[in-house]
Amino acid sequence: MKLHELYPFPEERASRKRVGRGRATGWGCTSGRGNKGQNSRAGAKHRAWFEGGQMPIARRLPKRGFKNYPFKVVFQPINLDRLLASFDGKDAITLDDIYDRGLAPAGALVKILSVGEVAAAVTVEAHKFSAKAAEKITAAGGKVIALGTPEALTETPTE
């Protein structure tokens, strides 16, 4: 196949529609824009949510609820089968090992989930474990080291 054989062929492409070239064309006069108003003018753009200057619906309705975005804690989930496949035969898996293998972005909070089976005893270090994942690892003779979230690590006990 050559460049000139690619579809659509230049002669098959529809030519550009030229508007405003007389009423006989069917696209003369207002050029398909209707009569007057903001949208008939050149450069007439308005945001999809703009309501013509009246108070927008988003501002007319009251706020509701609570937004917890600044304090949201997001974990990077990793399934047991993927974790153990990446560290085949290794008896201890640290958080740095997980980051180095690219299973989670560096610095991400890691949670181990229970999809997959544990054949050999292995020590796994992560921020959080699902109950079933921890159960599977300990049942195979392994050890679970839950680091917790950074906030939990920096908290000082009060008396």
Swiss-Prot record:
| Similarity remark | Belongs to the universal ribosomal protein uL15 family.
> What interactions and quaternary structure are annotated?
Part of the 50S ribosomal subunit.
| Described purpose of this protein according to its UniProt entry | Binds to the 23S rRNA.
What segments bear the compositional bias annotation Gly residues? 23-35
| Pfam families (alphabetical) | Ribosomal_L27A (PF00828)
Q: Which InterPro entries match?
A: Ribosomal_uL15, Ribosomal_uL15/eL18, Ribosomal_uL15/eL18_sf, Ribosomal_uL15_bac-type, Ribosomal_uL15_CS
The protein's matches in Gene3D superfamilies, at most eight in alphabetical order, are given as: 3.100.10.10
**What name does the UniProt record give this protein?**
Large ribosomal subunit protein uL15
Q: Which UniProt keywords apply?
A: Ribonucleoprotein, Ribosomal protein, RNA-binding, rRNA-binding
What Gene Ontology cellular component terms go with this record?
Answer: large ribosomal subunit
One Gene Ontology BP term is:
translation
What ranges does the record give for the region Disordered, renumbered to this chain?
14-44
Keyword Ribosomal protein attributed? yes
> GO molecular function terms here?
rRNA binding; structural constituent of ribosome
- Give the HAMAP family listed for this entry: Ribosomal_uL15
